[in-house]
Amino acid sequence: MKTFVAKPASVQREWFLVDAEDKTLGRIATEIATRLRGKHKAEYTPHVDTGDYIVVINAEKVRVTGNKAKGKIYYSHTEFPGGLKQISFEKLIEKAPTRVLEFAVKGMLPKGPLGREMFRKLKVYAGPEHAHTAQQPQLLEL
């Protein structure tokens, strides 16, 4: 018997809805990253995007444990000398609540073109409303 290799054209993708309210950031991000990669499927192939679409609602209500709300720092650089920027979790969740979950999931995906393609299937919304009711996403309990 030969090893099965999934073809990009034959992959069946589903839509899932995840409610992030009162969920721990890292735990929900690992489950989302696994689903985006397609590792939960029997036909998973490392070099093919076999993952599903994930719609996350209530991203503003995600939480972190311990003192990470003040202590977790996100860094970015403007690429100019002295251009290192930093912002705490507490301030970033107020300023751009969707970015917190996006940063966590993106760091768990492969780096390169395949990882960017997987990341495009993640749709994050700060509140309970989303624009994907036409796709009829299934509720995913994590």
Swiss-Prot record:
GO terms for cellular component: cytosolic large ribosomal subunit. PROSITE patterns: RIBOSOMAL_L13. InterPro entries: Ribosomal_uL13 (IPR005822), Ribosomal_uL13_bac-type (IPR005823), Ribosomal_uL13_CS (IPR023563), Ribosomal_uL13_sf (IPR036899). It comes from the Bacteria. One of its GO terms (molecular function) is mRNA binding. The keyword Chloroplast does not apply. CDD domains: Ribosomal_L13 (cd00392). Part of the 50S ribosomal subunit. Belongs to the universal ribosomal protein uL13 family. This protein is one of the early assembly proteins of the 50S ribosomal subunit, although it is not seen to bind rRNA by itself. It is important during the early stages of 50S assembly. PANTHER family: LARGE RIBOSOMAL SUBUNIT PROTEIN UL13M, RIBOSOMAL PROTEIN L13. This is Large ribosomal subunit protein uL13. It comes from Colwellia psychrerythraea (strain 34H / ATCC BAA-681) (Vibrio psychroerythus).
